[in-house]
C-alpha cells in the first residue's frame, strides 16, 4: 500500500517535472529506512532520460517540497529513471509499449496461473489482452496486481 503522502507528492512533483519537460512515472516513499527515502522516477519523453534530467528535477523538486512542507521530518530525496524494467501504469504507457514483452502478475491466480508472460496487445476498461505464442489471453484487470516490461527478452 502506498504511503498516504504519495498523492500529495505526485500533485506537487508533476507540474515541477512538466516545467522541465519531464514526466513523473512513479513515486515511492520508503519509511522503513532511517532517514526515510522518497524516490521519484521520471522520464524524458523527448530522449533517453539522463543524469542531467535527474539532477535538474532533484533540485527543483527539493525546493518545492521544502516550501510546501509536505514531508514533516528529515528524508532523502532520490530522483531516478525507472529504466526498461519498469511497471506499466498509465494508459499512455500501455499504448506506447504495445507489442512489447511483459510479465503480468495476478492475485488471486487467474486460470491457475499467478504470472503471465507474453506480448502486450492492449487493455481496455475491463480486460488486458496478451499474446502468448499466437494465442490471445484475456486477463481481467481487476485481478492484475502488476504489469512490468520483460527485460529478459
Curated annotation (Swiss-Prot):
One cellular-component annotation, GO: cytosol
InterPro entries hit by this protein: Ribosome_maturation_RimP, RimP_C, RimP_C_sf, RimP_N, RimP_N_sf
Domain of life: Bacteria
One Gene Ontology term from the biological process aspect of the record: ribosomal small subunit assembly
Principal location class: cytoplasm
Keyword Isomerase: no
Pfam annotation, one family: RimP_N
Annotated keywords: Cytoplasm, Ribosome biogenesis
Localization (cell): Cytoplasm
Functional note: Required for maturation of 30S ribosomal subunits.
HAMAP family according to UniProt: RimP (MF_01077)
Family under the similarity heading: Belongs to the RimP family.
Protein name: Ribosome maturation factor RimP
Gene: rimP
